[in-house]
UniProtKB/Swiss-Prot annotation:
GO terms for cellular component: cytoplasm; ribosome. NCBIfam families: 16S_RimM (TIGR02273). Keywords: Chaperone, Cytoplasm, Ribosome biogenesis, rRNA processing. Residues 101-178 form the PRC barrel domain. This is Ribosome maturation factor RimM. Gene3D superfamilies: PRC-barrel domain, RimM. An accessory protein needed during the final step in the assembly of 30S ribosomal subunit, possibly for assembly of the head region. Essential for efficient processing of 16S rRNA. May be needed both before and after RbfA during the maturation of 16S rRNA. It has affinity for free ribosomal 30S subunits but not for 70S ribosomes. InterPro entries: PRC_barrel-like_sf, PRC_RimM, RimM, RimM_N, RimM_N_sf, Transl_B-barrel_sf. One of its GO terms (molecular function) is ribosome binding. Binds ribosomal protein uS19. It comes from Pseudomonas fluorescens (strain Pf0-1). The keyword Transmembrane helix does not apply. Its main location: cytoplasm. The PRC barrel domain binds ribosomal protein uS19.
Amino acid sequence: MSATPEKADDLIVVGKIFSVHGVRGEVKVFSFTDPIENLLGYRNWTLRREGVVKQVELVSGRSTQKDLVVKLKGLDDRDEARLLSGYEICIPRSLLPDLTADEYYWYQLEGLSVINQDEQLFGKVDHLLETGANDVLVVKPCVGSLDDRERLLPYTEQCVLAIDLEAGVMRVEWDADF
């Protein structure tokens, strides 16, 4: 494990260390990938928390249904592992697999202006939630938005009509009163 002074500009958060596992320095990880095991395909991670950035190498990992238990190179002690709790796990954007024309990574949707069929600006996509049935867009008001309401919109084909990443716009079929 090594610290690095490099700024992590083009990194994507793909998981988070939330606890320790056992006494041999393993850590528990919540993976943001789908399926969660995809995180284990990236061997070199950048860990980030409150301005501190560390480079680590994944040695091994396994799934425990809801999360992962991983072993990092040079981390052999429970107390040392505990210090990594709360760190985000990041990888370079360039390592993400290419998607088809109608697929998007969550990070690409965050910040898009959300406009309904009546040309009303609801706000901007702040983040997404995974609910099981379908993902949910959390849209927060911004300058020029219709009102000051936060909206939760289903990320489904019925609701999301079009996405234009270059224009920074997502068009939705959603009534302003919902």
